[in-house]
Structures are given as structure tokens and as C-alpha cells.
Amino acid sequence: TNFAATPVAHPILANLTLIGNGGSKQGVRLRAGTQVELYNTLITGKGQPLTVETTETETALKEGVSKLEYVAISKTLSSKEGIYTNDMFAAATGNLTAQNFTWENLYEGTIDGGKDLSADSFFTKAEYKGAVKTGDNWTSGNWIKQ
């Protein structure tokens, strides 16, 4: 398999709260040449909340083609190749490891301090990590199945 084949998808994702089922396996798994920009995100509920693997994926992170910024995880980053390590992740802008998250109503909660992405008109300014701020539950209402 050629993990350097083109075209390469490169999504930009921001203000996510990802809570796993408490299992011991991986939560977010970046591999197979994946490129991504992930900002203002909370990841918890898995034995390995954030795993990176394959030379191409880890090299893109190390060289800044892919970015993980203002990402808080409940344990440490797992690196299969050792190219992009937990120390590199922890040193990146705004990242936090070994966090104990507190939730209201199952999934409400954020951590102050996030990347302002409002220069891109697609994003709304949200200077916090996570998706749903306590007391500002935008998920309630008629658009979501209750």
C-alpha cells in the first residue's frame, strides 16, 4: 500500500469533544498517510485516546503539514513509529496530556484557551477546547433526536 499516494485528504476539524466507551483500545487513530489539522479538541474515554502511526502520517505531523493544536487528551499520545512523539505533541501550542475531564449532562464541558479560527469565515470564534460549553448547550432543540 502506498500511503504517500495523491490526492491526500487534509480535513480541518475544530471544537470537538470525543468521549469513548471506556474501552482499552484506540480513540482517535491517525494513520495510512492521513493529514489533518485538529484544533480545540478534547479526547477521552479510551485506553489510547490519540494514536499516530505510519511514517507518512507521523512525518506530516513532525514537519507541520498536519497540526494538532489546543488538543487535550486524557492520557498520552501513542506513537507507533516514534517520529512524532508524545513529547512533541505536549510541546505543541496549547496541547495538554493526562487530563481529568469533568462533564455536565454527559458531555458539556470545555477547557479555556483555544485557537481563534474566525479568520476563516467557516469557523465561529470559540476560544476554548471542546464542543459544548457548560451552560451554552447548542445541541439542545429540535434539530437533534432527544
Residue ranges and their predicted role:
Residues 1-146:
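Extracellular beta-rich repeat passengers
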